[in-house]
Structure formats: structure tokens, C-alpha cells
């Protein structure tokens, strides 16, 4: 699927106080390896994550999912927002090319998400860009032969920036070379596309 508008951004949308509150909440958790696969591979992903479920965070991000879905005319139907992921990338840490959408809907082991799969992805930039180097979000769009198919999303460099994009878009986080990049990531899940 080639999209007219493959992502929607809100540069510096959240206040420093809101970012500080999210960071404090995430750092209060015991951060675990971000490798979610059954076969650990730091060549694909090296980061640390914590899972957050505070209602105020869902209230904060839900309008961004709604606004992007309508303004970009994706018009995806979704029923749930999955557990939120606080992510930290330190020097040498990264996340290689991947898509967030699963190949099949979630099975019974995923409880309330059974029968759903990821449709929209959201990321909030929680670090000041002066606090780290590298760690850039890159998205791939369009036809593979296009020279501009890979785009570094510089619009979300300022702290408090938000991006929403379809979960089937390939994307990555380039290696952090200095400092620490912090983000809050979320996914809106819905029934399979017809």
C-alpha cells in the first residue's frame, strides 16, 4: 500500500514537565532488555524497556492516534491501545529495520488483544536532542526503486515531539553514539484489514 501521507508529526507538542513526568515514571521501573524475540539478537535490537499502564498516559496519547488517523485519511478501525513501552537507547544501542504489525492477529495468550493486530504506531521523543547523538528514527516508504524511500524523521528531534504512522511501515532507530535517547512507544490495535 502506497500512502499519500505516510506519517503525521507534532514537533515539540508536549511540555518539558510532561516529558519529565513520563521519564520519571519509566525510570522508576526495572528496565529490561528490549529484545522481544525468543532468539535474542542484539544485531536486530539492543535497548532497554519498561511497560507502563497508567491511565493518564493513555489519555495523553489517544488524541494523537485519532487525529493522525483522520487527518492522513488512513481511516483505520482500532479497538485498543496496547500496553505502553518506555524505551531507553544508550551508546551502541539501536533497533534495526522492522515493522510493528504482526503477521497474524494475536492469539488467546494475548488476552484482551486476542484477534487484533497492530495498525498504528506512535512514538514520543522524551530526550533533548543535545543529550544524545545518533538514535534517529528512519522510515521506509514508497517503491523500493525510489532513491528517497528512506527518510530520517528530523521533525521529531525536539523534545516532546510525537509521530504516528501505520504499523506496517518499515522503520528503525539508528545506533546511539553518545548519551541516551528516551521514548514512549504505543500501538493502536484493531481487527484485521478486510
Region spans (language model):
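Fe(II)/2-oxoglutarate oxygenase catalytic core
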Residues: 1-164, 168-194
Amino acid at each position: 500500500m502506497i500512502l499519500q501521507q505516510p506519517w503525521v508529526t507534532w514537533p515539540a507538542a508536549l511540555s518539558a514537565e510532561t516529558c519529565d513526568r513520563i521519564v520519571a515514571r519509566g525510570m522508576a521501573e526495572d528496565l529490561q532488555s528490549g529484545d522481544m524475540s525468543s532468539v535474542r539478537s542484539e544485531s536486530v535490537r539492543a535497548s532497554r524497556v519498561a511497560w507502563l499502564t497508567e491511565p493518564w498516559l493513555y489519555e495523553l496519547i489517544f488524541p494523537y492516534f485519532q487525529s493522525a488517523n483522520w487527518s492522513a485519511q488512513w481511516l483505520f478501525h482500532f479497538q485498543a491501545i496496547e500496553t505502553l513501552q518506555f524505551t531507553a537507547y544508550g551508546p551502541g544501542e539501536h533497533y534495526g529495520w522492522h515493522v510493528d504489525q504482526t503477521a497474524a492477529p494475536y492469539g488467546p495468550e494475548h488476552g484482551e488483544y486476542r484477534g487484533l493486530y497492530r495498525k498504528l504506531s506512535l512514538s514520543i521523543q522524551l530526550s533533548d536532542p543535545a543529550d544524545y547523538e545518533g538514535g534517529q528514527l528512519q522510515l521506509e516508504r514508497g517503491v523500493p526503486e525510489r532513491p528517497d524511500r528512506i527518510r530520517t524523521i528530523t521533525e521529531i528531534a525536539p523534545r516532546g515531539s510525537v509521530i504516528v504512522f501505520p504499523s506496517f511501515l518499515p522503520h528503525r532507530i539508528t545506533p546511539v553514539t553518545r548519551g541516551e535517547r528516551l521514548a514512549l512507544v504505543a500501538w493502536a490495535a484493531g481487527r484485521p484489514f478486510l
